[in-house]
Swiss-Prot record:
This is Putative uncharacterized protein encoded by LINC00313. Widely expressed; not found in heart and in muscle. Residues 1-22, 58-77 are annotated as: Disordered. Residues 58-68 have a biased composition (Basic and acidic residues). It comes from Homo sapiens. It comes from the Eukaryota.
Amino acid sequence: MTTLSKSKQPSAAGNLDEQTPGECFCRSCFVTSSEVWKRWKHLDPACAADPWEAPTPRIEKPDGKECLGRTSCPRLA
């Protein structure tokens, strides 16, 4: 049996706890900043291989933080 480990990167921008192995977590929520998206694409191999781009117009959050993790996103579909 192979155990997939979840890598955690220190960041104040998001939460990787709910990342599904093999799935780009960036795409599972709203990313409000293209710069943040580019940064996370370098951290997550699944994101780097994904052609998805941040939606426009950018969605502003009341707390001003980008929504990157599933648990931190109040607007999951």
